[in-house]
């Protein structure tokens, strides 16, 4: 499987059986810059924590960098 990986946001091969994930959360600059984003691959979908949104998928390049909604 191929997943986008931060910080370069380039598509890279991940080991067999892994999933791609997109993890987003707010930090001190969230209202100005938007949510922080972490893209990668993992053996299993990362555990959801309070204030962190995680989406996992299992097809090539299914985790593109999310677009910020404009007001």
From Swiss-Prot:
Pfam families for the chain: Toxin_cobra-type (PF21947)
The organism's place on the tree of life at top rank: Eukaryota
This protein's GO CC annotations: extracellular region
Keyword terms: Acetylcholine receptor inhibiting toxin, Disulfide bond, Ion channel impairing toxin, Neurotoxin, Postsynaptic neurotoxin, Secreted, Toxin
Coarse class of the protein's main subcellular location: secreted
Protein localization: Secreted
GO MF annotations in UniProt: acetylcholine receptor inhibitor activity; ion channel regulator activity; toxin activity
Disulfide linkage: 3-20, 14-41, 26-30, 45-56, 57-62
Tissue specificity statement from the Swiss-Prot or TrEMBL entry: Expressed by the venom gland.
Annotated function: Binds with high affinity to muscular (alpha-1/CHRNA1) and neuronal (alpha-7/CHRNA7) nicotinic acetylcholine receptor (nAChR) and inhibits acetylcholine from binding to the receptor, thereby impairing neuromuscular and neuronal transmission.
Family, per entry: Belongs to the three-finger toxin family. Long-chain subfamily. Type II alpha-neurotoxin sub-subfamily.
Protein name per UniProt: Long neurotoxin 3
